[in-house]
Structure formats: structure tokens, C-alpha cells
Amino acid sequence: MAHSMSRPVAATAAALLALALPQALAQANTSYVDYNIEANPDLYPLCIETIPLSFPDCQNGPLRSHLICDETATPYDRAASLISLFTLDELIANTGNTGLGVSRLGLPAYQVWSEALHGLDRANFSDSGAYNWATSFPQPILTTAALNRTLIHQIASIISTQGRAFNNAGRYGLDVYAPNINTFRHPVWGRGQETPGEDVSLAAVYAYEYITGIQGPDPESNLKLAATAKHYAGYDIENWHNHSRLGNDMNITQQDLSEYYTPQFHVAARDAKVQSVMCAYNAVNGVPACADSYFLQTLLRDTFGFVDHGYVSSDCDAAYNIYNPHGYASSQAAAAAEAILAGTDIDCGTTYQWHLNESITAGDLSRDDIEQGVIRLYTTLVQAGYFDSNTTKANNPYRDLSWSDVLETDAWNISYQAATQGIVLLKNSNNVLPLTEKAYPPSNTTVALIGPWANATTQLLGNYYGNAPYMISPRAAFEEAGYKVNFAEGTGISSTSTSGFAAALSAAQSADVIIYAGGIDNTLEAEALDRESIAWPGNQLDLIQKLASAAGKKPLIVLQMGGGQVDSSSLKNNTKVSALLWGGYPGQSGGFALRDIITGKKNPAGRLVTTQYPASYAEEFPATDMNLRPEGDNPGQTYKWYTGEAVYEFGHGLFYTTFAESSSNTTTKEVKLNIQDILSRTHEELASITQLPVLNFTANIRNTGKLESDYTAMVFANTSDAGPAPYPKKWLVGWDRLGEVKVGETRELRVPVEVGSFARVNEDGDWVLFPGTFELALNLERKVRVKVVLEGEEEVVLKWPGKE
């Protein structure tokens, strides 16, 4: 953050921090940048720097005889014994994300802030040779579109393996600020690309698979890396109409908070046993998230079952933001105290390190209050083997991972697999795709590659990326396969200049196939950057229209790229546009993946995990309106409540082959169940009655086409009489991916449906089973349907602790 006025740090902290920290700040809000408008915090070097990392020496160092080095003691006892050795200044110096360590104890500095959204970021990459790159996977929104939970887990496991290899070389931390499990509620949001999409049940499954993949199979004894579920909670706006994320106060009903904005964090804490949670910049209902004990204690620890000694980190500078711009605290010292007492253990920033001494002097905090958070952090580090000897792999199975493991896991080519599985075929007129090598031999085919994504490299990665081993553009991929490529950028992402149109039309004229690759990228959607419009930007549609007019009988394929959707209704309705695909941010192998989908080496089976709205949607009501249900100018948010007509619906996705979907022998078309009977079933092994399976939705899936293909399924529920109005249009209750269904083969799809899938959330936030009639239906086509009648008395299956 930009701070122009300063005053000395409290004297008791100055001796330790004088060399590491600049002077502290004056307390007048008027002195600072207006963070109600500015969405990027100006972080100090101490916060953002990456530092060389090393392990404490428990064999020969000063700590060798202390309990912290006793591998038979509990992680908490070991951590608590270490923190008890700190002076107050040393304790405070280790409350920030860049912990300064304690040199007299042989405790190295530690950097909490490592990123792992879709690969290692904020690692200490070498300039060349070993450790100069790590695998860069597709952005989560594309990976989730594959509807393959095993794939999510595998990606996270690879990231964790590579992270531990880097950690062993002193180049990466033992915890990561990932995953981002906020839901992509409004299409203008700049960080939707980082998320699993707009559906909260998808986000919850993504959270579970990613977190358990990152943390390993035995996190209590051998934590691989500590995951951080972020951003908790109600965070999904960056800077829309100058409403800065740093100062937003989001008004959210208890109903929506319970039903939409927190279930994924509940699953992360209760089921995935996430070791860390990040509180968000924004306030919810008047209280900054990092100063809200209702969020951090009542919900997270008392209700969601957060692990006993898990720690909460602020988003970077969010502790400071409690003071400026929220104005919830009268000074930075007061803001630090508010955050500590609410349950924010570690400050990603420098507010704690500069001002906690003042908080203690003012009587707002005790040493014990501060110790609690640092003990929690170091408990996690103990679980990850930070203090353990490296004598045998049996002591810690991850301490001998090395560069060879990075090479091995990258060679599995899972980044490519994730991209090909996630790409969504939106339109395919007259089955023009795939452009097979038989019909279009590479040696005799000229491909015009046009548009601002046609030669994309870094663009493929989206945001939060580190060094990738390679970045394959669409142009390079087609050239590598032997096609002659006529490349012309034609226009930029947001350009209104037509100076490149002539070259683009010339490239198309002499080609056999025209591929336009465009859409949006991180110049329009990013952290601290929302879109104002969800129309295609600049003059891209004008160029596509000219290409369509000039195409004649040539195939014109449009690749719609970027994390958020754009209104492609004109392309959907243009008969000259042969095919339309959504490719997201496909990662290091993105060009290969796009090429192989187009040419049929891989067949598409992804489905949209966001709604493609008409452009007018973003102009109808404020993006800061958090109410999901339709009211006034708000036509309803997400596919669950939207009352308008989508361009392409959530769950849309085409195949190259055809599938016949029918009821299986185990499908019962009507099921009657008694609520009290359901709830009397044994469920002691489950964390919640909401997880109890009620029935299996089954269907026969037969490949009736000419190509082997994966098949993806979404099962939706709807009701018009169970519980009070208004009723959602439908909601997702399960999904799956069947791999490699051969031509003529029939597979049985089996999707379990749990108690929670039939529960509706009342105005108090309670999840309730109401008597009534539900319909379960397969995909958007609804060819397989099951009627479920719940009888008996309504029952609360999950009690929501309202905020007093």
C-alpha cells in the first residue's frame, strides 16, 4: 500500500525490526491512497519478497535438546515449546507472512506466502538448469469443466510433489495460498478464472479433491504441503465501478451465506481437513472478514470443524484494511488487535509486525493472544516435517524429493490431459469438427490462424503462474504437426483499429481452414480488475464477421478463450461460423490441446461450469448485489436462479459422437421416501447426516456415433412444492465422467444423491428437508428423469448458527 506519512515504530520492536522494516505509519486515513477505489494494495518489500529457505538443524543446532526437536512429542506440544522460547519482540517478528525467524535459536526465516493455484508460483526459481521451472496446469475453471474429480486430485498431488522438491532445495515453502474456492457468482469478476465456476457443489468437490491432493494421504502424521482455502468469505468483486475489494462491504443474507457463500469452506474444513484458511479483504454485513469472530470462530472452528490447530492467514494487507479503508478500527494497532482477537493468526502483510507492541501497550492484547496464532503456524510446520531429521525416508516420505521428481511428474503430461478434457464444444454445425487428418492431411492443408490468441504463449497460463517448462501456442502446435500456417493477428483483445484486418483476410483467403482465436485475457480479467462488459471486447466480432463473409465453404472455427464468458450469441446464430469452442486458459500445453481437439486426436467432453449470459445481463443490476434470488432489477444469479435466457447454459457441452441416454435396469422412475425414515438410518461414520446417500441416480449411456469418446454427466434436481417459494429453477446434485466409451458400447452411469441435495435453506440459514416432490434429470437434455417424493414432517438436517 502507498503510505506517505510515517512515525517511528514502537520502541520495543524497533531494535529487532529496524533493519527489516521501514517506519510505521501515521494514523490519519486522509493521508493514504483511497482504498475504497484502489483495488491493489501497495505491499512493502518485506511482505512480497521471496527469501532463501532452510531447515532448522535439530541434530547440531541450538534447538537440538529442546522439545521442538523431539519427534515423539505431539506437533502442538513441540510448537508451543518453541514459541515459549521467543522474546516478545521475536514473537511479534514472526507474526507476518515473512517470519524473520530467531537467529539465536538457529530458527531460519520462513515465508508463508507461496502460491499453487495451478502450479508453483512465488518459488525461488533458478536462472537455468534444475529448479528453473515447474509444471503449469490449466486454470481451475477449465480443469473443473472436465468433470473429473480424480484429475483435480492428481493435479494437486503433482503440484505438491513438485513443491516439496523445491522446498527441499530451499526454494519453496511448506504451505500454499491455494485453492481459491470462491464461487464465480457474477460474470464480470476478474478472478473467476481461478475458481471451479459458479456452482457451490462443484466448488465443494473441487476443494476436497484439491486440498487432499495437496496435503497428502496422512496430513496428521506426514503433511505434504498445507493448503489454504481462500478467500473466506463473500469475496467475488475486484474493482467493479470503482468498488474496491479492499473496502467492499457485502450485504449477504443468512440464507445466501449458508447456502452459497460458505458450503465449500465447510467441506474444506470438515472433510478435507484443510490446515489453513485465508480471510478475505471485504467486509460482510459491516464487519471486515479478518476481524469477524463470527466467521473465524463461530462458523469456522465451532461449526465447520476446522482442525484444532489450523491457522488463519489474512489476505495480503487485509489486517491493515480493517483500519483503512474499512474504518472498523481507529488505528493500525487497534486493527491488529481486532484481527488477532477475532482469530486471524498470521498477517500477510506487516501490520502485526509493526503494531502489535502498541496493541499490548494499549492493553488490547496479551502475549498469549499473539502466541496462539504463531503456535498454530508452527504446529503445521512440525506436521510437515520442518524440524525433523533427514536420516531416512521413513522419518518423512517427502524430504528426499528432488528435481528428478519434478521432471518425472511433468513428463506424465497431465497438464495436456486436463486441457483436452476441459475444453468445451459449444457449437458444431453440420459436424464440421473434427478436421481429421484423413479429410485435411497436414502436408496438404493450409490453416489460417488469426486473432490475438493465435500465437499466445504466456496468455495460455492465466494468472498466478510461475516459470513453465514450455508454452505451446496454437500456431506452434499446428506448425509442429506439419500444417502450413498463415498467421495474422488481425486485431488485439481490446483494439478498435482495423489496420490488421487486410492481412487477416488475406491469410484466410489462401487457406483451407480458418481458425480465429480470441476472446478475453488478463488485460481485461485479473486480480484487482473486473470487466465492465461481458460482450466480446474491441472489434473482434467485426473481424470474425468479415472472415465469415469471406469464408465461403471453408470451415471457420472460433476459439473463445479466457476464464469468464463473453456473449457469443452472434457467433451461435451465424451460419457461416462452423464451430465454436471455449478453451479457458489451457496451460503450458494449451496449443497442443486445442489443435488435437480440433483435429480429432482428442474428442471434447467438457461442460460449461458458468452460464454464458447475454451482454445485457451485466448492465441490469449492480455486480455488488449479492442476493441470488430474483428481485427488482436483479433477474437472479447463477443458473440456479436466473430467470432470463442464457446464450449457453451452465452444463452445456457437445460431443463429436452421439450418445443415447436411457433408464437402466436399476433405475426406478418414481421413488417415495419418508423423511423420518431417512434420518433414522445409521450414519455414525459420516461427518454430517447431509452426507448420507439417499439413492443412486442411474442411466444407461450408449455410444451410438462413430467415434470413441468420454461422456460427462450432470444430474440436476428441481421442485415446485417442497418448502417455501421462490423455487430455484434447478440445482446440481451430482456429476461424473465416463472415460473412453467405445462405439456401440453401453455403460451404466451411477451418481449417488445425498440427503443434503434434497435440503433447502430457509431464511435463518438452516438446511431443511421439506416434504414434497422433486425431479432428478440428466444433463440439459433431461432424457432420463426420476421422480422423488419426500413424505413425513419437515426436519432440520443442518443447523445454521445465526449471528447475534
Curated annotation (Swiss-Prot):
It is an enzyme of class 3 (hydrolase). It catalyses: Hydrolysis of (1->4)-beta-D-xylans, to remove successive D-xylose residues from the non-reducing termini. GO terms for biological process: arabinan catabolic process; xylan catabolic process. Glycans are attached at residues 29, 124, 148, 242, 251, 357, 390, 413, 444, 455, 573, 665, 696, 718. InterPro entries: BXL, Fn3-like, Glyco_hydro_3_C, Glyco_hydro_3_C_sf, Glyco_hydro_3_N, Glyco_hydro_3_N_sf, Glycoside_hydrolase_SF, Ig-like_fold. This is Exo-1,4-beta-xylosidase xlnD. Gene3D superfamilies: Glycoside hydrolase family 3 C-terminal domain (3.40.50.1700), Glycoside hydrolase, family 3, N-terminal domain (3.20.20.300), Immunoglobulins (2.60.40.10). The active site is at 315. PANTHER family: EXO-1,4-BETA-XYLOSIDASE XLND, SUGAR HYDROLASE-RELATED. It comes from Aspergillus awamori (Black koji mold). It holds the Pfam family Glyco_hydro_3_C. Its EC number is 3.2.1.37. The keyword Signal applies. It is found in: Secreted. GO terms for molecular function: alpha-L-arabinofuranosidase activity; xylan 1,4-beta-xylosidase activity. GO terms for cellular component: extracellular region.
